């Protein structure tokens, strides 16, 4: 066979018949996922849901809503955080084109189409999609709902700290520091503006330096808030909060808040939303137990949940330098805090804390790290909520896929194959060692002069092999 050579410039064919178009066997994970969606009647359901938001019988037909949501699912399963990356991946892969249902003769949707559709469809449609997936879990007995864990994390916003401006005057950071230097008499009004090095030196020397959300905002994304990230750096960010079923690891609610909201401010709202989602998914179970970390502990929150809800809290108390003083607080507050302390320090409370730490942190690892949601490329809290809800729905679909087909992600199929090969190899080695042992034992029986020591030595060598 002669060696083929790649041509630097190739003349493309003017016309290609259908039988010459490239074919793909498809990815088994996405074929199975399409099977699950088809069995649930996803496309007809989502088209009926989105129909009121389109013109009736006028204009060019849009991209089907099922294709839009599938592309967002691809973003989670492939770990792609940007819409440009999703559009490129879908156009580049024959198996993903098959998953989306796009014929080979048609172009895949552009990234701008995702923006248009997202802006057209309200948050309620994305929320309905999340609940539809929860209903699938409910039908497969993958929701328990009685005991939940709550935790939060920060998402980096699509806005830079360099772009923030003063709310009162509209000055950016350089203009603000220049004015302070003029007021301090370090420079005159008619002097040339100081360079960046002089501004940084002056900024470090200030004792009352403060960057507050009350005074500063981002013109790029006014909904983003200044917050400290998990790695200790300061960024404009959002806050994501998960309510996780501790029985199955399913996400019951995935809420996005402003980053300056404290955990104690959002706990009750997230629990209520999780209960609403459970009911709309067809579950009759009510949330009874809620476990969270010490960041969610406050006297007011514990008391509010005890007196006005049915949730039983398991929230550890933060360490205090001094004992709590109850003389200036109502007795019901003391009773609520002591009851929560007693439950949390018990055997069941410690078990729930271990489960919460394992399962809720795992959902953030899947959605934010491998799912690509740690850094958002969208502006506005409404847009961030829409995209994050679909990422959480994709996580729940992964749980369903793992339950049905033993693979929760496209990469999980390869891991399953490796695990299966490892099990087969282990059984083969065990069988080989056992065979050698019985053979050596038979030889020692037929030749009494052989000692038991030699038999044991041969067996040891067989096990090592």
Show the residue positions of the predicted features.
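Basic, short loop/linker segments at the boundary and entry of helix-turn-helix/winged-helix-like folds
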Residues: 26-73, 78
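A detector of single, family-specific signature residues
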Residues: 50, 87-88, 98
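Anion-binding and metal-coordination hotspots
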Residues: 81-91, 102-465
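Short, flexible loop/hinge motifs at secondary-structure junctions
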Residues: 1-23, 169-171, 180, 413
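Short amphipathic alpha-helical interaction patches enriched in hydrophobic/aromatic residues
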Residues: 54, 75-76, 98, 118-121
């Amino acid at each position: 066979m002669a060696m083929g050579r790649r041509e630097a410039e190739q003349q493309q064919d003017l016309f290609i018949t259908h039988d010459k178009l490239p074919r793909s066997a498809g990815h088994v994970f996405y074929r199975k996922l399409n099977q699950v969606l088809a069995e649930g009647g996803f496309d007809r359901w989502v088209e009926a849901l989105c129909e009121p938001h389109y013109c009736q019988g006028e204009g060019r037909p849009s991209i089907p809503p099922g294709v839009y949501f599938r592309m967002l699912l691809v973003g989670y399963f492939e770990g792609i955080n940007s819409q440009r990356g999703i559009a490129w991946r879908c156009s580049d892969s024959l198996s993903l084109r098959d998953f989306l249902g796009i014929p080979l003769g048609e172009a895949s949707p552009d990234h701008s189409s995702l923006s248009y559709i997202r802006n057209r469809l309200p948050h309620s449609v994305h929320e309905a999609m999340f609940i539809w997936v929860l209903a699938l879990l409910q039908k497969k007995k993958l929701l328990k709902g009685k005991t939940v864990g709550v935790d939060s994390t920060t998402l980096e916003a699509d806005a830079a700290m360099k772009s923030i401006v003063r709310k009162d005057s509209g000055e950016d950071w350089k203009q603000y520091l220049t004015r302070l230097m003029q007021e301090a008499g370090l420079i005159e009004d008619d002097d040339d503006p100081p360079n960046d090095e002089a501004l940084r030196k002056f900024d470090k020397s200030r004792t009352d330096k403060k960057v507050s959300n009350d005074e500063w905002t981002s013109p790029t994304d006014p909904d983003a808030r200044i917050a400290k990230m998990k790695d200790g750096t300061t960024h404009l960010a959002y806050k994501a909060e998960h309510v996780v079923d501790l029985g199955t690891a399913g996400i019951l609610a995935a809420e996005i808040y402003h980053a300056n909201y404290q955990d104690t401010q959002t706990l009750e709202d997230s629990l209520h939303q999780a209960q609403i989602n459970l009911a709309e998914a067809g579950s009759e179970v009510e949330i009874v137990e809620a476990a969270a970390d010490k960041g969610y502990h406050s006297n007011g929150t514990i008391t509010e949940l005890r007196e006005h809800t049915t949730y039983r809290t398991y929230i550890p108390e933060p360490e205090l330098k001094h004992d709590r003083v109850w003389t200036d607080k109502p007795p019901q507050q003391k009773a609520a805090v002591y009851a929560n302390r007693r439950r949390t320090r018990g055997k069941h409370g410690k078990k729930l804390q271990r489960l919460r730490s394992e399962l809720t942190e795992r959902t953030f690892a899947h959605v934010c790290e491998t799912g690509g949601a740690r850094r958002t490329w969208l502006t506005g809290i409404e847009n961030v909520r829409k995209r994050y809800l679909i990422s959480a729905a994709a996580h729940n679909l992964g749980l369903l896929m793992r339950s049905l087909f033993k693979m929760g992600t496209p990469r999980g199929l390869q891991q399953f194959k490796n695990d299966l090969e490892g099990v087969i190899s282990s059984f083969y080695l065990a069988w080989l060692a056992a065979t050698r042992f019985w053979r050596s034992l038979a030889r020692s029986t037929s030749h009494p002069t052989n000692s038991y020591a030699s038999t044991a030595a041969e067996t040891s060598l067989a096990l090592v092999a």
